[in-house]
UniProtKB/Swiss-Prot annotation:
Identification of the protein by name: Hemoglobin subunit epsilon
Metal-binding is among the record's keywords: yes
Amino-acid positions noted as binding heme b in the UniProt annotation, renumbered to this chain: 64, 93
Subunit structure: Heterotetramer of two alpha chains and two epsilon chains in early embryonic hemoglobin Gower-2; two zeta chains and two epsilon chains in early embryonic hemoglobin Gower-1.
Record-level GO BP terms: hydrogen peroxide catabolic process
Family the UniProt entry places it in: Belongs to the globin family.
Gene3D superfamilies membership: Globins (1.10.490.10)
Xref: SUPFAM superfamilies: Globin-like
PROSITE patterns, sorted: GLOBIN
Pfam families named among the record's database cross-references: Globin
Amino acid sequence: MVHFTAEEKSTILSLWGKVNVEEAGGEALGRLLVVYPWTQRFFDNFGNLSSASAILGNPKVKAHGKKVLTSFGEAVKNMDNLKGAFAKLSELHCDKLHVDPENFKLLGNVMVIILATHFGKEFTPDVQAAWQKLVSGVATALAHKYH
């Protein structure tokens, strides 16, 4: 279980309140699919994923990215119980979708890059440390149901 200090929680909540979930979610998933092309196999029904511009402009990528980042908001609300907050998603990704749990770490790291891009100087090393801790905790929680 990940333990967050009061300062880390405050830091995460403060930045999360400024995140444009639709924009950042689409960018994060899009970047994941471009940088780690093997992850595209989970999105066969998304249509054209043939190039970076096709991926980043794909409405299904944007919509699913928003959905992913919206569910990440559950992590922000449930920092003290990440495993509980992500139990059903962990089961879905393990039993039905068969997603390699390593992909959760990759997406978390991409998300941190997107946040750094969006928030620039406001995304200090302390802010990054808090967010890295959160995305790592989410990746662990999502991998929890794997055998």
